[in-house]
């Protein structure tokens, strides 16, 4: 079943509430089309799956465990560099489109607080 904009809007709103103020603990890229972000709130730990798989693109919380490659791909290393330890500030969506923005407050190499946005455009 294709993911429509209305369903994605409800998912984004629920993620915003559930993951409010969560911090990124880990990032994994189990496959070329999937990114798993482990986020911790004060009381819970969640695994957020961002999947760009053809025919099943989605953003959701998951309890599924994934087998990760021994050597992380370059994209995963880049995401770790810029997002690990970041605090989730906002989850928002482009109205009527299937683009979800995850805004994080992170610390850069100089120790300054910066805002990084991870954009998930879900097609297919």
Where are these regions (language model features)?
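Gly/Gly-Pro- and Ser/Thr-rich, intrinsically disordered tail segments characteristic of DNA damage-repair
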Residues: 1-124
